[in-house]
Amino acid sequence: MPVTKTVKMLVAEAKEQTNSISPADAHDRQHSGDAILIDIRDIRELQRDGRIEGAFHAPRGMLEFWADPDSPYHKEIFATESELVLFCASSWRSALAAKTLQDMGFSNIRDMDGGFTAWKTASLPITKDD
């Protein structure tokens, strides 16, 4: 069966329908208390590449379940009025995730442009597991 909509097309649509934020602005908003950073990367990526201090890890496969207040897996961090800034390695998965949370009714969602890779390129602080 031929693919009629590629992942690039899905990501492009998601990016058109969601708000984004630069890594520098995400850093500033996190440190001013106006935003919570949500890291949706796989745990192996965090272990290999490091993490953003203070970011909440919500694996992409659990995101909807953790965000839904009616789910038995709900995490209270998603019941906030603060802005939630999602990121992955390059902002493809996080764009799709931001679109999904918007579809669920969240209005306080942003996708971090370029993801963790752009954060590191901007020389913003990261921590590494020992």
Predicted features by range, described:
Residues 38:
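Active-site flanking residues adjacent to catalytic metal/cofactor-binding acidic residues
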Residues 1-35, 43-83, 92-130:
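Rhodanese-like catalytic fold shared by cysteine-dependent sulfurtransferases
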